[in-house]
Regions:
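Amphipathic alpha-helical interaction segments
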Residues: 53, 59, 78, 82, ...
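A conserved beta-strand/loop capping segment in the N-terminal third of enzymes
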Residues: 70-104
Length: 425
């Protein structure tokens, strides 16, 4: 692979680009990495990305940076040199260069605000001279020798980029809502209004979603004057992310993942990653008696006086209708958001590779050791869908160094058991 095109200039893109930079400097083979980003490096951690106001704190330790866990297995005899070179782009190196390392230690190693995390990613991008294209991806097609990606700049002019490999990152659009209604805000609208202190007056508010996106929105809402704040999610309760050594070790070191059954893997992901709030957010909400949980899936939205009526469905009881003055769609990113960019031929090839119509479960089960869809002639890396097949740390910030090792590995099939397709039942 000579060229790898990455969609989205977030932590995963920076991890792969930095590792490629290090490998090349050490005289080892690595592809040229080109990154396409609509906003800015680290844009989803800034207000411009629509997923945050930039003022809330990172849900994980910043020491899990673009090189973590600094345990490269890329090239026998050269791994220590790779690890040492990657440490030049670590979170602590960023703090040392800016003269804030001692203060950060003395304050107890706090998680940084989102905007500070974005600054760290931008610092890495400058240090490695990131090959960055600012623009919006319009379409993706597969040609004779790889991928062809159409990118529109700020003035609407299209540029065609070609690459041997393609990696998709990011959560998709932050402007999506469950339904078109004046009292239902997308997460982008919510953060834009919250940043201007212009949220609509509301006595009864609801946050739809049970993951970290919803947790951050709740963390903001409790700072506003509201009588009740309801959290709507299909889970029986709002779970807290496990932060013990045993749970964290599965995220940092996915080597034991292949030995777990499918049910055990799903249990780990459900209990520790999907639909959970961070410990810090849960502690902030603990003493606020305005916050309550409503179990169910939203199946209908309708007008109601000056607000919105939301119908919740549960398997074991009749539908329930609740009314709110304001609701925020914080269900988070859409795992398959990128499929709408693929042309019909690329879609057909992808369906042939996964063995049927494109569903999340089929794509998840097709992810090989190198975090790419198995069976495609041109590599398509989907780390955000790699949790079930390869390990729970790949879709998030838990093992970015391992992620870059696998994507850039010259022997993607060397871990035979991890590369075969899973049978999902």
């Amino acid at each position: 692979m000579e060229t790898l095109l990455v969609v989205g200039a977030g932590p995963k893109a920076l991890a792969v680009a930095a590792k490629s930079h290090v490998l090349r400097n050490l005289g080892l083979p690595a592809p040229r990495v080109v990154v396409v980003e609509a906003h800015a490096v680290g844009g989803n951690w800034l207000p411009s990305g629509g997923w945050t106001d930039g003022q809330h704190r990172l849900g994980t330790s910043p020491e899990k940076d673009i090189g973590f866990p600094y345990r490269s297995t890329w090239a026998r005899g050269r791994n220590q040199a790779i690890n040492a070179a990657m440490k030049e782009f670590s979170w602590t190196s960023f703090l040392v260069e800016h003269g804030t390392f001692a203060e950060w230690i003395d304050r107890g190693r706090p998680s940084p605000h989102h905007h500070t995390w974005a600054r760290y990613l931008q610092w890495v991008a400058r240090a490695i001279d990131l090959d960055l294209v600012i623009g919006t991806v319009r379409s993706i097609r597969q040609g004779d020798n790889g991928w062809s990606v159409s990118v529109a700049d700020a003035e609407g002019r299209d540029t065609e980029l070609t690459a041997d490999g393609l990696m998709i990152t990011g959560p998709g659009r932050s402007t999506r809502t469950l339904a078109e209604h004046s009292r239902i805000l997308s997460i982008a609208e919510f953060w834009e209004l919250a940043g201007r202190r212009a949220l609509p007056a509301a006595s009864r508010a609801a946050v739809i979603g049970g993951g970290e996106t919803a947790g951050s929105a709740l963390d903001e809402l409790v700072r506003h004057e509201m009588l009740t704040i309801s959290v709507i999610s299909p889970m029986a309760t709002i779970y807290t992310r496990g932060e013990s050594y045993f749970e964290n070790a599965l995220f940092s070191d996915p080597s034991k993942w292949a030995a777990l059954s499918m049910q055990e893997r799903r249990d780990v992901i459900r209990r520790t990653d999907r639909g959970v709030f961070s410990v810090r957010v849960q502690e902030n909400l603990l003493g606020d008696n305005r916050v309550h949980h409503l179990q169910g899936r939203v199946v209908r939205v309708a007008d109601h006086a000056d607000g919105v009526a939301v119908t919740l469905r549960n398997e074991l009881r009749a539908d329930q209708v609740h009314t709110f003055d304001l609701a925020i769609d914080a269900t988070g990113g859409q795992p398959l958001w990128f499929l709408e960019l693929f042309d019909s031929y690329a879609t057909d090839l992808l369906e042939l590779a996964v063995g049927g119509p494109l569903t999340q479960s089929r794509l998840e089960s097709s992810i090989g050791y190198d975090l790419a869809v198995s069976g495609l002639a041109s590599k398509l890396y989907l780390p955000n869908l790699a949790a079930l097949a390869q390990g729970p740390g790949f879709p998030n910030l838990s093992c970015l160094g391992e992620l870059s090792d696998r994507v850039l590995s010259p022997e993607p099939a060397r871990a035979g058991s991890g590369a075969r397709r899973l049978v999902v039942r």
